[in-house]
A protein has these predicted regions:
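Cytoplasmic helix-loop-helix junction between adjacent transmembrane helices
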Residues: 99-144
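Hydrophobic core of transmembrane alpha-helices in multi-pass small-molecule transporters
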Residues: 17, 83, 94-110, 301-315
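C-terminal ends and interior cores of transmembrane alpha-helices
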Residues: 78-92, 96, 284-297
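Helix-loop junctions on the cytosolic side of multi-pass membrane transporters
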Residues: 170, 174, 178-196, 384-393
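C-terminal transmembrane bundle of multi-pass solute transporters/carriers
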Residues: 2, 43-45, 54-58, 62, ...
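Helix-loop boundary and gating motifs at the non-cytosolic
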Residues: 2-55, 88, 212-258
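Conserved MFS/SLC helix-loop-helix module at the cytosolic interface between two early adjacent transmembrane helices
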Residues: 53-92
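Juxtamembrane intracellular "pre-TM" segments in multi-pass secondary transporters
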Residues: 1-6, 185-220
Length: 462
């Protein structure tokens, strides 16, 4: 394993661990009740938060692609800082709703950006994406450790002081995360393509999402993964309430769910998800876990089933993310990846309403059947997507010929001798081909070095 890759990603790992130290999360509902929230006002806050994230996710991804992914993550941490400050200073519902909306900006800015950073860094350092799942898995492990530690420490801190204090103690961790992000050497692949207008970039991003069936299929798969995962984290505790679980169980239960993000990251790097039997096993066990939730009245079985479900979803999310990154060029990678988050929110809102209605009318366990339906569709999409990706990885003659044609045109491209029509075609090919983009970057670097050498030679005295 390349040592330079480990050293380069070390600041990113530190930043993600610090960013996960949000100490107020475990006591948020307690604090909200203290400042006057009712079930109705909680719904208003959730609606405001849910409206912000999907609206900003794709635009923030395009910002990351055109400007700086590191800079976008710094802005995300600033959003977390501002949200925590407003939340900690809140004494009424209206102010806290503003804090929740700013937190939505934080999630929108970070959605899809970290995955794109890791993928391009691995690609730059190793020349392939083979180690992507290993390193994004390590990122998820570090992030999970931050979540678990903050979940336990936040409760202890609130008990010793107050829930409000947890908001302010979060601030130094978010500030330290900004410093760590600034120390990270961001990959440059997404900047090597010839700059295009914002309008062209947006058109290419949405065109890739809407007109390429394999990309649309992967986005739907990731959206289903996100919807199910969010359903587990948002509605999972209701099973414990329905089964009259003791209060002492909620802390370890939540820590177990948080730990699945890290364990899932570890397993995603170890499991060979290009093998059909393993993929089919995931596609079968995932809905089986939801069936247990629908049928059992055992508290232990519910906790185990939810933990297994969250773990499997974490594994699938990482592999599906790699398939998506493999399918799109670096220049639009963060924007397209953010589209999965947007689609997840669009699916989750009606799904959450359906879960709430079924839970109220027929009891919480019956909502497990809705999860089963979504899990079956997820399993089918997973199998189809992996098989499709396997076929797509075989060398294709037309693409090879297109790359050879571009190599023949490089001289005219660098000399500015291409006609506008040919130049547009070359730029379109570069936007979809990381290999040719890297080749052109190396040629330009060589030409610049030769130019500097020639200038130095001319200036030498006789």
């Amino acid at each position: 394993m390349p040592r330079t890759l480990a050293g380069r990603l070390a600041p990113l790992l530190v930043a993600m661990g610090l960013q996960g130290m949000i100490l107020w999360v475990p006591v948020e509902k307690l604090f909200m009740s203290q400042i006057g929230f009712t079930p109705a006002s909680v719904g208003v806050m959730a609606a405001a938060y849910a409206a912000v994230v999907p609206l900003l996710e794709v635009p923030s991804g395009i910002l990351a692609d055109r400007w700086s992914r590191n800079g976008t993550m710094v802005l995300a941490c600033v959003g977390l800082l501002v949200s925590s400050i407003i939340g900690g200073l809140s004494h009424n519902v209206a102010t806290y709703v503003v804090a929740a909306m700013v937190l939505g900006v934080y999630f929108a800015l970070s959605s899809g950006t970290v995955d794109s950073i890791v993928y391009d860094t691995v690609l730059e350092e190793t020349g392939s994406s083979d180690l992507y799942e290993t390193w994004i898995g390590r990122v998820r492990i570090v992030e999970s450790v931050g979540f678990v530690v903050s979940a336990l420490a936040g409760g202890v801190l609130a008990e010793a002081t107050s829930a409000r204090t947890a908001y302010f103690v979060t601030l130094p961790f978010a500030a330290a995360a900004i410093i760590a992000f600034l120390r990270f050497d961001e990959p440059r692949l997404h900047r090597d393509v010839e700059p295009t207008s914002l309008r062209s970039h947006i058109a290419l991003t949405f065109g890739t999402i809407l007109r390429r069936p394999e990309v649309l299929q992967l986005l739907l798969l990731l959206a289903l993964v996100g919807t199910l995962a969010q359903a587990v984290f948002e509605f999972g505790p209701l099973w414990l309430v329905a089964l009259a679980a003791p209060a002492v169980l909620f802390g370890p239960y939540w820590a177990a769910l948080m730990s699945t993000l890290g364990v899932g990251g570890y397993l995603a790097a170890k499991l060979d998800l290009t093998r059909t039997p393993i993929v089919v096993a995931l596609a079968v066990v995932t809905p089986a876990a939801t069936v247990v939730l629908a049928l059992t009245r055992s508290l232990a079985a519910v906790v185990i089933a939810q933990t297994v479900l969250a773990l499997l979803l974490a594994v699938v999310a990482i592999h599906a993310g790699r398939l998506l990154h493999d399918a799109v060029p670096s220049a639009i990678r963060a924007g397209v990846s953010s589209g999965a988050g947007t689609a997840s929110w669009v699916l989750f809102l009606p799904f959450a309403l359906a879960l709430g209605w079924v839970g109220r009318e027929q009891g919480v366990p019956r909502t497990g059947w809705l999860l089963t339906g979504a899990a079956l569709l997820l399993g089918a999409l997973l199998v189809v997507s992996v098989r499709r990706a396997g076929r797509a990885s075989e060398p294709a003659r037309p693409e090879d010929l297109a790359c050879r044609e571009l190599v023949d045109l490089v001289t005219d491209l660098l000399d500015g001798a291409l006609s506008p029509a040919w130049r547009k075609g070359v730029e379109a090919h570069l936007s979809a081909c990381d290999g040719c983009t890297e080749y052109l970057r190396q040629i330009r670097t060589t030409v610049e070095a030769l130019g500097r050498l020639r200038a130095h030679t001319v200036q030498l005295p006789p």
